[in-house]
Every structure is written in C-alpha cells, then in structure tokens.
Amino acid sequence: MKGKTMRIAVAVCLCFGTVSAQEQLRVRPAEVQQEDVVAALGALGVDVLRFDFSDFTRENYDVAVYLDEADSTGTERLYTVRAGGTRQQLTRMPEEVRRGFRKELHLPETTTEYVRGRSLTLIFSQKNDSTKLLTVHIPGMMRFSLPLELRDSGAGGEPRYFYSLRPFKLSAVEAGSEEIPLVFYSSGWYDPKAGVVRSCGVSEIDPALTDELVGLSPHYYVVGVIFEKKE
C-alpha cells in the first residue's frame, strides 16, 4: 500500500514539474519594424509613399513633379515643379566647380558625370483640419511642400473632411517623354440613405481615371511625375 502511495506521489510530482516547465513564458523586447513606423505615422495623420525611378537614370531625363486638382467643373494643373536632369555632366562645369562637386560627393577624379536622383518620396501630413500638406522629396535634386485645400464632404452640420489616399497602377513605359500619375488623393461622398460618408472602391487607380471611384469622388488631387528624355 505504501509503495502504491509513493508511486502516485511521484507521478503527481512529475506532472507538476512538466506544467512548471511549460509555464516559463516570456515577453521580450524586439526591434521596431517598418510596419510599426508606418502605423505610428498613420496614427499621427501622416502617409508616406516612395517611388523608385532609377530606370530613368540610364540616360539623362528631365524630371518634373505635377499636381492636378479636379471637381465637377473639370481638372486644373495647379503646379509643375522642375528638378532638372537625372544625370549631371561635370565636363560642362568650370574646373573649380567640378572639383567642388567631386569633393562633396566623394567622386573619383576621373568621373565625368553622376546620377543626381533615383527615387521620389511623397509625404502627406496634416496642417490643420481643412488643409493637408504635401511634401515632395527627391534626394539629390529637390524638396518642396504644397498645401492641399480640403472640402467638406457635404454631410451637413459641422464641416467634415474625409479623404483617402490610393496609388495608381504603374506599368512599364517606352523611352521618351512620359507623364506618370503616382497618387490619387480623393474626397469621400455623402450617402444620404445610409447617413455615412463613403470612399469605397479599388485599391489602385487606373491611370486613365476610368474607375467608378473617380466619378463618385466630388473632389480629388493627382500627384505625378514627368520624364522628358534629353538629347
């Protein structure tokens, strides 16, 4: 009888030992990931999109960023901001200026040209309730900001500004002069039957602006880039 009792006690101890080992669980610090940064920026009302245009540095292309605004009355090009060429010819500079460029950019003495820019970043941040601030940054070429005036969604009562950001579909283009829309920033529309402001539709906009969402949005902006091949 005593032997049986001892075996049961040993078995119980082994079971508790197993449970105890399984309960050694921990939460550990971890490195902040890109999705965490994106989520934090979103919580602050900031959206960031980056585009790689390094294909347009194989040859020299003039780069310009444009901003269009559209509503029921039509479309207007508000701004076209030129950044210059994607490649810089050092041989066309005075020798003193050339040496300064080489020193600043850590270029070898034999360098005759260099790539000025390879990517474009668009930053949408909140200036106030009715104004968004668009910042365009092309490292090595230019940086500027433009205000985007928002419009009331028409829901009645206090003004409500409900806008959403969608990228355009991007496809390969032929070498030459190209105008490429990058981002569609659009107002929602008020649905009186449901009593809500909607902004339903595709996740990527067709460059031809044929999506139903485009027709339903009462006000939107298009941000794009123009490449013109230099002979």
Predicted segments with their positions:
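Structured domain cores in non-transmembrane regions
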Residues: 57-158
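Short, solvent-exposed mixed-charge patches
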Residues: 230-231
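Short amphipathic, basic-aromatic surface patches that mediate peripheral association
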Residues: 53-55
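Mature extracytoplasmic/lumenal regions of exported proteins
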Residues: 117-121, 125-227
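Short N-terminal segments immediately surrounding and downstream of signal-peptide cleavage
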Residues: 23-39
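Bacterial Sec-dependent N-terminal signal peptides
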Residues: 1-26
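Hydrophobic residues positioned within well-ordered beta-strands of beta-sheet architectures
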Residues: 49, 63-65, 223
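Contiguous beta-strand segments within globular domains
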Residues: 43-51
